[in-house]
A protein has these predicted regions:
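Anionic ligand-binding catalytic core segments
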Residues: 1-131
């Protein structure tokens, strides 16, 4: 699951703290938008001059299932922000940092309908992604 990616970060990446926070942010985002097709091929790493780092996020689309493809912690893949928050230590994050990240993600996705309108996405197209 996601903790396998976290383990890779711990063992191989530079800026471990930043990469772990970014991974956690992506898990929270996937839960918030209903992207449950979040298998290992949707996560990558880039080798930079300073070392390995998470690649930019890609293939993050709502699929609206109740469970993630990957475990969000050591025991469940249920799409649940409380479960993610309660597992913050498994991502080597202090709880207040995890709360901040989840809060930022919630703020970022809350106005998706307004953004869809500004980008001229049809109501029919936007409704497909209603969350």
């Amino acid at each position: 699951g996601y903790l396998d990616i976290a383990d890779f970060i711990l063992q191989n990446c530079t800026n471990v703290e930043d990469n772990l926070q970014e991974l956690y942010r992506r898990v929270a985002f996937n839960i918030c938008i209903g992207n449950t097709d979040d298998h290992f091929r949707n996560h990558g790493f880039l080798l930079t001059a300073k070392g390995w780092t998470l690649s930019p996020a890609y293939d993050m689309n709502p699929t609206l299932n109740e469970y993630q493809s990957l475990l969000i912690n050591s025991s469940t893949n249920k799409s649940d922000l409380n479960g993610l928050l309660n597992s913050s230590e498994e991502y080597m994050l202090q709880k207040h940092i995890a709360q901040q990240i989840i809060g930022e993600v919630l703020v970022a996705v809350k106005d998706w309908k307004i953004v869809a309108t500004l980008l001229s996405i049809t109501k029919r197209g936007a409704f497909r992604y209603y969350i």
